[in-house]
Amino acid sequence: MAEIKTLRAVQPRANRPQEFNGLYQIPTLDEVIALAKSQSRLSGRTIGIYPEIKHSTYHADLRNANGRRQFGRHYFENRLLAKLHAEYGNSECAPVFIQSFEVGNLQYLSKKTDINLVQLIDADDVNADGSISLVPPYKQPYDFVKAGDTRTFADLLTADGLDFVASYADAIGPWKPYLVKTVADNIDRNGDGAITINDRRVDGSTGVLELAHAKGLKVHTWTFRNDASGYGFADPQAEMTYYYDLGLDGLFTDFADTGVAARDASTNTGSNIEACGRHGRHNRQHR
């Protein structure tokens, strides 16, 4: 920890402001929670946190020079839960979502906590026709690869796949092009003389969002940026509003002011968002 605290954050994107480089340390989970709670008190509204568990399978297999496991299975999951339960309680109404691209760690957590769990979904890219590009090693959760499970991220977005996800998670977090179909048809729609991802034709919902809601899962997606807009959209606020209008429950953006404006401009009233604890695995438990 002392070594990590010698590091300072820098802005990796050259087109963004650089004046804060070197001013701030890498925050710990304790510090993030303390900040969220203090700002909740100051603002009079609840500010949550959204931690991601990274590379559970890799860390579980990691060994030292003597061949002994350095951490073992579920070391980080257990430590995270101990902290979150101490700070927020073991409650489905806690202002917390725990996310992961792996499956096994979320299945383990689902037996240990009522805090909301999110199955992240990513792969390689999207093809020209808007379908999910499934290229190894990115096409599967890493724990599936290690276990010899042939299912891909795309399989998790089918009706059967979402039923499976809803057995242990409360929400899905697919990359945004997996929710809205866009097609590369070589038309310069914004007239800038170049064909980019912004020029892709928007063909509406892929159906994943609606199917996930039908399975009782919330849907969050990522990442929206003013300076790097997305597939089929040149205007970042219009892009986010489009997703909200489809019924999206939440999104990640580097530009919160644009995200709030997009949400407020949406026709989505939030009626698709059920009461606390009535989605995913919790929805099944309450039936």
Regions found by a protein language model. Give the residues of each.
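C-terminal active-site rim and adjoining tail of enzyme catalytic domains
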Residues: 108, 112, 116-280
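Metal-dependent phosphodiesterase/phospholipase catalytic core, i.e.
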Residues: 1-156, 160-161, 167-169, 174-179, ...
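Extracellular glycan-recognition regions
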Residues: 282-286
